[in-house]
Amino acid sequence: MTTPSGSRPSIGITALGTYVPPRVVTNKDFEAHMDTSDEWIVSRTGIRERRFAAENEFTSDLGVRAVQDLLARDPDGLRDVDVVICATATPDALFPSTAALIAGQVGLSGAGAFDLSTACSGFVYALSMAQGLILGGTARRVLVVGAETLSRLVDQHDRSTAILFGDGAGAAVVGPVPQGHGFQEFVLGADSAGGPSLYARCMADRLPGGILMGERVGMNGREVFKFAVRVLGDSGQQVLDKSGLTSADVDWVIPHQANIRIIEAANERFGVPMSKTVVNIDRYGNTSSASLPLALREAVDDGRIQDGQQLLLVAFGGGLSWGACTVKWWAGAPSLTAAQQAEVTA
């Protein structure tokens, strides 16, 4: 499915914030309880460490911290927000929605709030939904949160999944931006035939009496790799075509941070070099719906992404699902100095 642009108001990201828990889990930490090594993990995934939430820290808590980071950068960032969307595969509970819990903690009680579940594709889906709500007149601005506590969902003794995932959150306000900036095109898709290749059946519930039952994350790594390379490359090319762009027009690719081999192979497929690709999987692992905002925020803060540059966001996830979008970046979203960032995350 594609969403056409045509002649319409410019909508984009007006504020951005992120959060990762302070607990660092290195590859060496896994060596104590499973047959693996730092060299084996790095060579196959590109991951060196990831962050795990504390026992009393839930998905909504991470999301709230990401919004607080956003507000530290832009104290007026939540002005006119009418709807909150949380993209997550690890909600605090089946209901109330994690979005509603976050809204209540950041001064947005009364705003519309709902969760969106397309696993690692969730942030792209949520950005598209946010734009639609604004263009349709339902909202003036939308707060989009991608937050995950995947460390609780995986079997920490399963080498095929435990080494891959980390916890984190990103928050973005979507709203009107200057003409010539913002979102250009979206491509969204899903194919349930591949669902058995990557799934999670149930999870811990933060409410009293919550328990973990049945299987956790299941994955056919070989099938997921083939799917991911194909769909990232194809959806990336499709959204470029819809935008009237070529790979040469792209200043930065921000891919879902799942596996460095997948990122490299997908880039080769649509012709963008790794030198134009934002990668931080080595420090955070696969944070699912949080991976895109974490990578985007980092590249804005360190000066790689500049006003007016052409961005390509691509993601895939369970479902199996995929999403891609083209964005002309607006630098009105404030960034923090290193000292300010340290104060926010302390």
UniProtKB/Swiss-Prot annotation:
<protein>
    <recommendedName>
        <fullName>Beta-ketoacyl-[acyl-carrier-protein] synthase III</fullName>
        <ecNumber>2.3.1.180</ecNumber>
    </recommendedName>
</protein>
<comment type="function">
    <text>Catalyzes the condensation reaction of fatty acid synthesis by the addition to an acyl acceptor of two carbons from malonyl-ACP. Catalyzes the first condensation reaction which initiates fatty acid synthesis and may therefore play a role in governing the total rate of fatty acid production. Possesses both acetoacetyl-ACP synthase and acetyl transacylase activities. Its substrate specificity determines the biosynthesis of branched-chain and/or straight-chain of fatty acids.</text>
</comment>
<keyword id="KW-0511">Multifunctional enzyme</keyword>
<feature type="active site">
    <location>
        <position position="256"/>
    </location>
</feature>
<comment type="pathway">
    <text>Lipid metabolism; fatty acid biosynthesis.</text>
</comment>
<dbReference type="GO" id="GO:0004315">
    <property type="term" value="F:3-oxoacyl-[acyl-carrier-protein] synthase activity"/>
</dbReference>
<comment type="subunit">
    <text>Homodimer.</text>
</comment>
<dbReference type="GO" id="GO:0033818">
    <property type="term" value="F:beta-ketoacyl-acyl-carrier-protein synthase III activity"/>
</dbReference>
<dbReference type="GO" id="GO:0044550">
    <property type="term" value="P:secondary metabolite biosynthetic process"/>
</dbReference>
<dbReference type="GO" id="GO:0005737">
    <property type="term" value="C:cytoplasm"/>
</dbReference>
<dbReference type="InterPro" id="IPR013751">
    <property type="entry name" value="ACP_syn_III_N"/>
</dbReference>
<dbReference type="InterPro" id="IPR016039">
    <property type="entry name" value="Thiolase-like"/>
</dbReference>
<keyword id="KW-0808">Transferase</keyword>
<dbReference type="InterPro" id="IPR004655">
    <property type="entry name" value="FabH"/>
</dbReference>
<feature type="active site">
    <location>
        <position position="286"/>
    </location>
</feature>
<dbReference type="GO" id="GO:0006633">
    <property type="term" value="P:fatty acid biosynthetic process"/>
</dbReference>
<dbReference type="Pfam" id="PF08545">
    <property type="entry name" value="ACP_syn_III"/>
</dbReference>
<keyword id="KW-0012">Acyltransferase</keyword>
<comment type="similarity">
    <text>Belongs to the thiolase-like superfamily. FabH family.</text>
</comment>
<feature type="active site">
    <location>
        <position position="120"/>
    </location>
</feature>
<keyword id="KW-0443">Lipid metabolism</keyword>
<dbReference type="Pfam" id="PF08541">
    <property type="entry name" value="ACP_syn_III_C"/>
</dbReference>
<keyword id="KW-0275">Fatty acid biosynthesis</keyword>
<feature type="region of interest" description="ACP-binding">
    <location>
        <begin position="257"/>
        <end position="261"/>
    </location>
</feature>
<keyword id="KW-0276">Fatty acid metabolism</keyword>
<dbReference type="InterPro" id="IPR013747">
    <property type="entry name" value="ACP_syn_III_C"/>
</dbReference>
<keyword id="KW-0444">Lipid biosynthesis</keyword>
<keyword id="KW-0963">Cytoplasm</keyword>
